[in-house]
Amino acid sequence: MILLISDLHLEEERPDITRAFLDLLAGRARSASALYILGDFFEAWIGDDAMTPFQRSICQALRELSDSGTAIFLMHGNRDFMLGKAFCKQAGCTLLKDPSVVQFYGEPVLLMHGDSLCTRDESYMKLRRYLRNPLSLFILRNLPLRTRHKLARKLRSESRAQTRMKANDIVDVTPEEIPRIMQEYGVKTLVHGHTHRPAIHKLQIGDQAAKRIVLGDWDRQGWALQVDENGFALAPFDFAPPLALPHG
């Protein structure tokens, strides 16, 4: 059994999401041969050299799962594209390129975060190309920590404001991109996150049936895609209620 998740946006301010993720690691993920995290795992990441105690605790939890025998694969999202080799080494996970083709029970499956499919959002695509440039990444990683914190806050604030202003079809994937990239990589199944619109879309590419699976974001509930010999099952799950404090 294989599990895929994305868009947890982990941060200290959302202990409910953190608790649900740790529960997943201690529960279902222990039975999985692999766990794939397809981007925006953290709400923000300014560099492996700037890990907070909270982020270190998440890193340690991943390491414990990895040491138990579950392989962990991590892909960059638009919020945590500065996650690097040092974090992955400590966490015991493998950094996946976006996009990547993997084999699930004999079927090639294309995995992506999903932001690169939103080609109608021209201003974002321009920013993405700039930020993902190796020279830009080198400069960003070598800025003073205070500057990186300020820049991350600015980018998050602007992203939220622009997302609210833009039409839904602009911030969603470009329909024409889906068959194009699936044909380019020779797959009949695409799995991605980013859009926060969980669904399994049935497609027709040429004369073949295909599908696009969109993972859900973790906000009021969690989402996970389970893959096994019977196929793909996308389902939400409720967060466990917070522990009640004893009275008196």
From Swiss-Prot:
Record lineage: Bacteria, Pseudomonadati, Pseudomonadota, Gammaproteobacteria, Pseudomonadales
GO cellular component: cytoplasm; extrinsic component of plasma membrane
Subcellular location: Cell inner membrane
Residues annotated to bind Mn(2+) 1: 7, 9, 40, 196
Ligand binding (substrate): 78-79, 121, 159, 163, 166, 194
Family, per entry: Belongs to the LpxH family.
Record's protein name: UDP-2,3-diacylglucosamine hydrolase
Membrane topology: Peripheral membrane protein
GO molecular function: manganese ion binding; UDP-2,3-diacylglucosamine hydrolase activity
UniProt catalytic activity: UDP-2-N,3-O-bis[(3R)-3-hydroxytetradecanoyl]-alpha-D-glucosamine + H2O = 2-N,3-O-bis[(3R)-3-hydroxytetradecanoyl]-alpha-D-glucosaminyl 1-phosphate + UMP + 2 H(+)
Amino acids binding Mn(2+) 2: 40, 78, 113, 194
